[in-house]
Amino acid sequence: MQTFGEELESLRAAGLFRSMRLVEGEQSSRIILDGREVLLLCSNNYLGLADHPLLKEAAIRAVERFGVGSGAARLVSGNMELHFRLEERIAAFKGTEAALVFNSGYAANTGIISAIAGRGDLIFSDRLNHASIVDGALLSRAKVIRYSHNDMVALRRLLEENRSTSGRRIIVTDGVFSMDGDLAELAELAALKEEFGALLMVDDAHGTGVLGEHGRGSAELCGVMDRVDIHMGTLGKALGSFGAYAAASKEIIDYLVNRARSFIFSTSLPPAVLAASIAAFDLVDSQAGADLRKGLAANSTRFKDGLENAGFNTMGSETQIVPAFVGGAAETMKFSRKLLDQGIFVQGIRPPTVPVGSCRLRCTLMATHSQADVDRAVSAIAHVGRKLGVTGC
């Protein structure tokens, strides 16, 4: 049996060792990283709301009125007025009867999936779904059937083969796939769930606030808002705050209150976070929010086109998440370091986050990037790619 130290050395030798960098000050398009200003190209703060004055003001007012902490789990004494106000806001935003907030996206997915599925049930999960979906499915003890990425023919065959099951059939997918930036085939998934009597759950962590005419997410973009049974999303990405949610029928939300262990056994979100999240939804619903979405879309297109013109494989990206394929772990991390030398901070993505041989730079655009920022980033990536001999992968 290897010691912990030996396992860590194995990770270092394979180019898979991870460590944390220090970010000073606010999250914006430029940050102070380990004491140096850099252009940020790997944040999920897509609309730039994490340091928005309206969110900060809402958080400060909430602390002054409600204090810092919530004190307990919501089923004990930690259920506050702001929890209800935020959940009502989310339900209205998503067009559902009710909503429930969780402490993180990971807690939401593990809690929801392990609550709604169990022994005798079937979970159909896209192979590129987020790790929190994978872990939630494993915790549920249901039978998990993974289908090839966005392969609706394969999914139909699997549903047909398991049509006679007496348990629940649940289709779970990312709305936007977090490492490739492409979209789920939500219209086809909705049709399949209706044909086979399944439930459809969509993790829209990277679509909420960003996609669709009103920022409702990938389901709005695909025209299936009312055909998704459980909308899951996060408050800490485009919305600039913290936490996550499920939006669904009142029956499903009541069920989660009674069965989702990550909700039941967690101290509830604090007032500042709740108030900032409410302010974020208000902003997303405003003309200012529409302008931010428009700016983000323009930046994403400009960046993706620039990388592709430089010969990079952007792996089918359709969103603000734009990968630049590299291949090996060591090469990818060297690429990331060389970019940092030029003042561009973008993380290399390695196994187990992505399969062996598919390492990439996961670049993420923000509405607050200028055109000059975008062009500078493209130029730096193209330059380093040529020097390392990975352009055109």
UniProtKB/Swiss-Prot annotation:
It is an enzyme of class 2 (transferase). Homodimer. It holds the Pfam family Aminotran_1_2. Pathway: Cofactor biosynthesis; biotin biosynthesis. Gene3D superfamilies: Aspartate Aminotransferase, domain 1, Type I PLP-dependent aspartate aminotransferase-like (Major domain). The modification N6-(pyridoxal phosphate)lysine is found at residue 237. Belongs to the class-II pyridoxal-phosphate-dependent aminotransferase family. BioF subfamily. One of its GO terms (molecular function) is pyridoxal phosphate binding. It comes from Geotalea daltonii (strain DSM 22248 / JCM 15807 / FRC-32). It catalyses: 6-carboxyhexanoyl-[ACP] + L-alanine + H(+) = (8S)-8-amino-7-oxononanoate + holo-[ACP] + CO2. Catalyzes the decarboxylative condensation of pimeloyl-[acyl-carrier protein] and L-alanine to produce 8-amino-7-oxononanoate (AON), [acyl-carrier protein], and carbon dioxide. One of its GO terms (biological process) is biotin biosynthetic process. InterPro entries: Aminotrans_II_pyridoxalP_BS (IPR001917), Aminotransferase_I/II_large (IPR004839), AON_synthase_class-II (IPR050087), AONS_Archaea/Proteobacteria (IPR004723), AONS_Proteobacteria (IPR022834), PyrdxlP-dep_Trfase (IPR015424), PyrdxlP-dep_Trfase_major (IPR015421), PyrdxlP-dep_Trfase_small (IPR015422). HAMAP family: BioF_aminotrans_2. Its EC number is 2.3.1.47. The gene is bioF. Substrate binds at residues 18, 130, 353. Pyridoxal 5'-phosphate binds at residues 105-106, 178, 206, 234. This is 8-amino-7-oxononanoate synthase.
